[in-house]
């Protein structure tokens, strides 16, 4: 499921897919179920999501991802 009904912002399938991909990749890196769940918590607005961005070397696109988080 790409869309989290708890998110109250704009529904944009492309943004959700992009944010969800970060969490999927982070889970694949660590293989810990709590990583995937925590990463998606609070509509991606959390420390685990930000740490995943850094661990996946997506830091140079950090602002773009955070903007997506604020949108959803």
UniProtKB/Swiss-Prot annotation:
Location within or outside the cell: Secreted
Molecular functions per Gene Ontology: neuropeptide hormone activity
Keywords, alphabetical: Amidation, Carbohydrate metabolism, D-amino acid, Disulfide bond, Glucose metabolism, Hormone, Neuropeptide, Pyrrolidone carboxylic acid, Secreted
Residue(s) carrying D-phenylalanine: 3
Modified residues (Valine amide): 72
UniProt function note: Hormone found in the sinus gland of isopods and decapods which controls the blood sugar level. Has a secretagogue action over the amylase released from the midgut gland. May act as a stress hormone and may be involved in the control of molting and reproduction.
Designated name of the protein: Crustacean hyperglycemic hormone A
């Amino acid at each position: 499921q790409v869309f989290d009904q708890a998110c109250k912002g704009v529904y944009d399938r492309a943004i959700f897919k992009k944010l969800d991909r970060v969490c999927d990749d982070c889970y694949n890196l660590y293989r810990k179920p709590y990583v995937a769940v925590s990463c998606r918590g609070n509509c991606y607005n959390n420390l685990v999501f930000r740490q995943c961005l850094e661990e996946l070397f997506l830091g140079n696109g950090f602002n773009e991802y955070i903007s997506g988080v604020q949108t959803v």
